[in-house]
Amino acid sequence: MNNQIKRNETEAIYRISLAGYLISTVRPTQKPEVVEGEVEKDEIAFIGRSNVGKSSLINMFVQRKKLARVSGQPGKTRTINYYRVGIKFVKNAEIGKEFLLVDLPGYGYAKVSKDERKKWHDFVGGYLMKSLNLKQVFMLVDIRHEPQESDLLCSEVLHGSEIPFSVVLTKADKISKNQMMRQQSIFAKAFDVPKERVIISSAEEKIGRSELLNKVGDWLEVFSEDN
């Protein structure tokens, strides 16, 4: 089943050329320092429930096993992790761009108090509202389950902020192909996004990486007249 999915995957026209950790911030408006002579980099953010597999997906995406680490206190960690990532056009290495991959703190952890949830909302909301260079958000959800209330609230925040986002269904290797197609349609309807913006993925089987790469490259306009 998984091999069939891999064969049907879109070919990646971009590749990751570099990936490294920059900084973890405790204020939503705090950003990595801009090197003199450089312009501020565009940002691509990843967000999702605690234990959705966000760190594993980020590591799969950049092909670095331990770049993003799992929080020891799911639902309570309020830091935004920034990574410097380079992406290049496969057929011409001279065409490329660097961007900031932003790992936002997880939400929806059952043991977290209402006060902690409000703090998360204010913290992440502050980042989303004030990040002028944010180009796109990947919202991760576990493909095995129905849309959760916290996921629906997150999608409402993104829609309300008019921030473009795509849904990434994680852990696809755990279910059948027929179930995948069914869940893709369910999540597209639940989050009010076109089906083509719902990506089926698996960090374990490296499913969905090509589609993620192509979307990021297109959002950043890597292959444009300016590059």
Walk through the language-model features, giving the residues of each:
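Amphipathic alpha-helical transducer elements in NTP-driven molecular machines
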Residues: 77, 117-121, 209
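Catalytic acidic motif of RecA-like/P-loop NTPases
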Residues: 59, 106, 145, 173, ...
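Structured catalytic cores of enzymes that bind and process phosphorylated ligands/cofactors
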Residues: 44-52, 58, 65, 84-87, ...
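Conserved G1/Walker A P-loop phosphate-binding module
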Residues: 2-109, 222, 226
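Short, glycine/charged-enriched secondary-structure capping and boundary segments
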Residues: 35-36, 61, 114-117, 152-156, ...
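Conserved C-terminal guanine-recognition region of P-loop GTPase G domains, centered on the G4
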Residues: 121-196
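Canonical P-loop GTPase G-domain recognition
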Residues: 16-31, 174-227
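Flexible beta-alpha connector loops of hexameric P-loop NTPases
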Residues: 107-117, 174-176
